[in-house]
Amino acid sequence: MNVKMDDCFQFGLGAFETISVVDGRLIFLDRHLRRLEDAARFLDLGMPAERGIDRIAVLEYLRKWMSEHDYRDRSGRMRRCALKIMLTQKNVVFSMRDNPYTTDIYERGFAMDISNVRRNETSPFVYHKTMNYGDCILEKRRSRKAGMDERIFLNTKGQICEGTMSNIFFCERWQDIHTRDRLRSSAWNSKGVYL
């Protein structure tokens, strides 16, 4: 892989999406591509489709990767994977990795606590998935040292924002999944939800 130096590698000004792959299918691909487009517009990276990132390109990358790699577990079932798309001024990168969240981990449950680091709800960066991820990585490492699986970020008003590596969803009737920008509850606004 030949990656060129640009503002992403110097300042974290790049966008990414990590997409769950279950049984060879990309989960919420279109939603991820829309979110990547929003971040690319915000960071002035050019539109992903014009840079070679669209539904067809992502599906082709996955198909090619699956044809070249053994993606089945010992029982013959497809492993859960994650496809990551990274977009910077000068780079477009696709990568694959195993999804570390196994059935055993889900059955055990996740231990988490609240981070002392606060999100700045006035910063436009908190509304986009950017490569500027230092707080998340350091807090994830600290959570592991404290015996936790995850840490939750609050903003300066004490409202729930996100996890270090996870998104937070609110479910209504188990069919309707809402992130903070889609939630209709009066308790939630564009900057979080009160604890």
Report the location of each language-model feature:
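Short glycine/serine/threonine-biased micro-segments
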Residues: 10, 161, 186
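Glycine/small-residue-rich hydrophobic helix-like segments
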Residues: 177-195
